[in-house]
UniProtKB/Swiss-Prot annotation:
It is found in: Early endosome membrane; Golgi apparatus, trans-Golgi network membrane; Cytoplasm, Cytoskeleton, Phragmoplast; Prevacuolar compartment membrane. GO terms for molecular function: choline transmembrane transporter activity. The lineage of its organism: Eukaryota, Viridiplantae, Streptophyta, Embryophyta, Tracheophyta. Regulator of vesicle trafficking, including endocytosis. Necessary for secondary plasmodesmata (PD) formation and development via the secretory trafficking regulation of proteins required for PD development, thus influencing intercellular communication. Modulates ion homeostasis, especially in roots, by monitoring the transport and subsequent subcellular localization of some ion transporters. Choline transporter involved in the regulation of choline metabolite homeostasis during root and phloem development. Modulates phloem morphogenesis and conductivity. GO terms for biological process: choline transport; endocytosis; leaf development; lipid homeostasis; monoatomic ion homeostasis; phloem development; plasmodesma organization; plasmodesmata-mediated intercellular transport. It is a multi-pass membrane protein. Glycans are attached at N163, N194, N403. Expressed in both roots and shoots. GO terms for cellular component: cytoskeleton; early endosome membrane; phragmoplast; plant-type vacuole membrane; plasma membrane; plasmodesma; secondary plasmodesma; sieve plate. This is Choline transporter protein 1. Residues 1-33, 263-264, 344-364, 454-493, 617-633 are cytoplasmic. It comes from Arabidopsis thaliana (Mouse-ear cress).
Length: 700
């Protein structure tokens, strides 16, 4: 049998085998897993270097606004041209847009001539409106004067310029089709103005194609996966106040309230949590139905500002919202049925939570402590999100390769129609940028797991002090045990925490990569049809999920033993696993039911955050003008995820209290031949009743 745990309490030997010390968990420790601490520090240095690349090369405006024919980002100031006011991208030549929509067309929409405007032009009922190129050369107009003239200086053109304009080669182009602001690009409406078209034909202009293709070509470009991804990332940047309030302050407030309620109304909290969880889940589902357009008239729309109510444009974002609405419906049904199934076990969870509530009452600093990792995570997320926006927009603006004969346009500086280097510009992403983005995402997950693990270890050390002092005088508990536990963690065990969080992050990353490969093969139709390969495919997915869940569970218990014993991560994992296996009959259902209630509590906080996120995003600020989000989907999911992380930090007070007391109970029983000397009476009663149930179920 394994000997006594090192340095659990004064009467045990310390981890290095030295003589016992006086007091509770006062022991001589050694620095553990130093190699992984060095790796973690190197990782942080790499994160800073990686982020500095993004800050140096990126421009988040690229995620929202398009490029003009010179490669300038609309809505920003450039060396030779100030486009700060001009945020809308407009395609000057409707025939180029039409040709880009043809299956056998040589011209791509990215090479069609575009400029940046203040608003989308509209055709006139009694005359022909023009939109002219940026004033240059002989056109002696300032940009502000050009804007005030509604981009029209046709009257100043020479006969040569007018002739090239009638050939749709500029510098002025007719406004034949109405257009609407769709995600900061003027999308043509394939309904030509009869009056404008008649004036154009009377002036001798070339034939202009009228077809739905002119509408679909732009729409296809706006709904491409790359464009949708850019808009989703841009939504995070636009909704940063929502993330601060609903992803930070709201879950912080709700988590503290939940802990206080657990402290004073523990008997009612499991019931309140289950009922509230189902109500919130249904409420969030209803909001998704509203945004999907299945309830009311508030569906997600890509159109910005006022527009013709009879004109509708549907983006890919609406499809995504509807998909999530269906998923939430399924989850709600499963959640309600599961809640009904666990009603009989809620009383057992109440008993376990009462033990945790007593710990919180005795060590009151535990309620306040999670605010420290919360503040550190908040600072990290602010830096991380800002860096992510710059990394996602850090591609190089390069000119496309195209057939120059299709993009000829009048050059005001050269005073002639120019077909050289008239292709459009695109943002080119190199492979190293993709690697940098994935490294940044992995870094976020590892850092989050590290902060959560550190918080859990500190809480475990504090609760262990409480447990082992029950058989002795209360002065034996060190003053402010939370800070004593923090000191031990910072001095000896940061490497062990870094290793545990790295293992979880690595397994989760592998699962993510395999899932991405699965989706890609599914789309391309390369998934094998043979039943054996399909079975192997789904079995591997299930195994990875099981491995992930097991590792997270083992890690949590390892952090407890790290806090108690000061041993390395692997040794602590082995000790914790041995203790649990030896006492599985006594602690089996108790721990599971307690975890279920706490998990539902975290979901309550995160769903509240998502609900508040929906309400904030439904305000005028995020439905119109510059801050309009393409869809509430990603900001709401971000609020949900941040709310869950904040709740995890605070709920770890209860979660780790239960787990630490149970593991301490197991060790206490082992050290005292099956009779725990320091266990609270309520815990003994709960565990003994659970053991009787397990024995009865095995014998019948």
């Amino acid at each position: 049998m394994r000997g006594p745990l090192g340095a659990v309490i004064g009467r045990y030997t310390s981890s290095d085998g030295s003589a016992p010390n006086d007091g509770i968990i006062k022991h001589n420790r050694k620095c553990r897993d130093i190699t992984f601490l060095i790796i973690f520090i190197a990782f942080w240095v790499s994160m800073i270097v990686n982020s500095s690349f993004g800050f140096n090369q990126g421009n988040p405006l690229r995620l929202t606004y398009g490029l003009d024919y010179e490669g300038n980002v609309c809505g920003s100031k450039h060396r030779h041209r100030d486009l700060t006011q001009l945020e809308l991208r407009y395609w000057l030549n409707p025939n180029q847009v039409y040709e880009s929509g043809l299956k056998d067309g040589e011209l791509k929409l990215a090479n069609a001539r575009t400029i940046c405007l203040l608003d989308c032009p509209a055709p006139s009922d009694d005359t022909l409106n023009w939109v002219c190129d940026y004033p240059d050369g002989e056109i002696r107009l300032k940009m502000n004067d050009w804007i005030d003239r509604n981009y029209d200086y046709f009257e100043f053109l020479t006969p040569e310029m007018r002739n090239s304009s009638l050939q749709l080669q500029g510098p002025c182009y007719p406004v034949i089709f109405p257009s609407v602001n769709v995600y900061w690009s003027c999308q043509y409406i394939a309904r030509a103005s009869n009056s404008s078209l008649r004036h154009w034909q009377q002036m001798g202009g070339v034939n202009i194609q009228e077809d739905m293709i002119i509408d679909k070509s732009i729409r296809r470009s706006m709904n491409s996966r790359a464009s949708v991804l850019k808009r989703y990332v841009a939504d995070i940047g636009k909704s940063w106040p929502v993330l601060i309030v609903c992803g930070g302050l709201v879950p912080l407030f709700l988590s503290i309230i939940w802990l206080l309620l657990i402290r004073h109304f523990v008997a009612a909290m499991p019931w309140i949590t289950v009922v509230l969880f189902n109500m919130l889940l249904i409420s969030v589902t209803v909001f998704y139905y509203l945004k999907a357009g299945w309830i009311g008239n508030d569906a997600v729309t890509p159109i910005i500002g006022e527009h013709d109510p009879y004109f509708h444009v549907y983006g890919r974002e609406l499809t995504h919202v509807r998909g999530v609405a269906i998923l939430m419906t399924f989850i709600s049904v499963v959640a309600i049925l599961t809640s009904i199934a666990i009603i009989r076990r809620i009383l057992m969870a109440t008993s376990v939570l009462k033990v945790a509530a007593k710990v919180i009452g005795e060590v009151q600093a535990l309620i306040i402590f999670p605010a420290i990792p919360f503040a550190m995570l908040a600072i990290f997320y602010m830096f991380w999100i800002s860096a992510a926006l710059h990394l996602f927009s850090s591609g190089q603006v390069v000119q496309n390769n195209c057939n120059n004969t299709n993009c000829c346009a009048y050059d005001l500086v050269l005073k002639k129609v120019n077909c050289d280097r008239c292709c459009g510009y695109s943002i080119h992403y190199t492979p190293h940028i993709t690697i940098a983005i994935f490294f940044h995402l992995f870094g976020c997950y590892w850092a989050t797991q590290f902060f959560i693990a550190s918080s859990a270890t500190v809480i475990a050390g504090s609760v262990a002090s409480y447990y082992w002092a029950q058989g002795e005088a209360s002065p034996e508990i060190p003053f402010l045990p939370v800070f004593a536990s923090m000191k031990r963690l910072a001095r000896y065990n940061l490497g062990s925490v870094a290793l545990g969080s790295l293992i979880v992050s690595f397994v989760e990353s592998v699962r993510f990569i395999l899932e991405a490969i699965r989706r890609k093969t599914k789309v391309s139709g390369t998934i094998p049809d043979h039943w054996f390969w399909r079975m192997a495919h789904y079995t591997s997915r299930g195994c990875l999920k099981s491995v992930e869940w097991t590792i997270k569970s083992v890690n949590r218990n390892a952090y407890i033993m790290i806090a108690i014993t000061g041993k390395s991560f692997c040794k602590s994992s082995a000790i914790a696993t041995e203790l649990i296996i030896s006492n599985i009959l006594r602690i089996g259902k108790v721990n599971v039911i307690g975890d279920v209630i706490l998990f539902l509590g975290k979901l309550c906080v995160s769903l509240f955050s998502a609900l508040f996120g929906f309400l904030m995003l439904d305000s005028h600020r995020y439905r119109a003008s510059h801050n309009k989000v393409s869809s509430p989907l990603l900001p709401v999911l971000a609020c949900w995820a941040l709310g869950y992380i904040v709740a995890t930090l605070f709920f770890a007070v209860v979660e780790m209290s239960i787990d630490t007391i149970i593991l301490s109970f197991c060790q206490d029983s082992e050290e005292n031949q099956g009779n725990a000397q320091h266990a609270p009476p309520l815990l003994l009663e709960t565990l003994d009743s659970n053991q009787e149930e397990e024995v009865q179920s095995l014998t019948h």
